[in-house]
Amino acid sequence: VPNLTETAAGLVAPRGRITLTRHTIEQEHRHLDSTGDFSGLLNAIATAVKIIANQVNRGGLAAPADRLARASNEVMTAETLWGGHLAATASAASGGIVAVPAPYRRGKYLLAYSPLDGSDGIDVNQSAGTIFSVLRTPRPGADPRIEDFLQPGTEQVCAGFALYGPATMLILTTGDGVDGFTLDRDIGAFVLTHPRMRVPEQTREFAINSANERFWEAPVRRYIGECLAGRSGPREQDFTMHWVASLVADAFRILTRGGVVLYPADSNPGRPGRLRLMHACNPIAFLVEQAGGRAGTGRGRTMELAPARLDQAAPLVFGSRAEVERIERYHGEPGDESFDGSLFNVRSMFRAG
């Protein structure tokens, strides 16, 4: 017997699981001018994610990590170009754009993506993922150009990431909150399991690659130093530090447990950041902001940056709002030298031995 419920209008409707397909169609029904292109694009992305997840889950049985990364890029391109929803794609793996070829119809959306973030850790069974960002093409019907993609993150229509871990998950925002879907392999569909995700406000966790400490600017050194000082320091509480070198894993942890993740600017002006603005920073920033958190460069909002190049890099600091705002405040204070490293007895904050 189907699991049914009576609606306010007296109609009988299914009350079962909400799949990604049903979710996106219901979202589109709220817009009278909707053509169905957007839900079609999301379904194509979901199909690509399922294929990539199957390859990743096979690990070394399928291919080495570098071949998996190339294969993931090919899957994303192949599954999204033919449906008539896109004008072009831009992959972090290729560095350029791929226009929808004839005879396929060109749509009104642009897709920027990182096909397999964290692929370097696959050989040690670490979680990897796919990050994507959807924009509207500024010149519908015209041959797409790289310049069409150079829009600030505030122009994103949709952003999300897939996480290939113990479960395959798809985290998504269309500008109205963040929802998490888990792949149910029995039915072959993504099912809503984490509705209306919110970044916890109170947190005592942070993530940063301490191997790059020598490149950090003074405000970042100050923030990390205060966290490491624990109860005896100015924060008067103990913090937990972690680092997995997987942006998607860190982003999911932020959405579920709170905290702050830092990919800070380097003191070297020739390297302003370590992550791609269009393919990684903007989509993660959109998700975090829609979940009530904050994402920035340490000095300002990530999504307000005006990209000059498709491969432009940027710093990224994201997580619980209060922690990100504290880091921004430290960057705004004059001097930026208030942190005294001698409190830790050695030049590094991470004491040896």
Residue ranges and their predicted role:
Residues 1-63, 68-89, 94-353:
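IMPase-like, lithium-sensitive Mg2+-dependent phosphomonoesterase catalytic core
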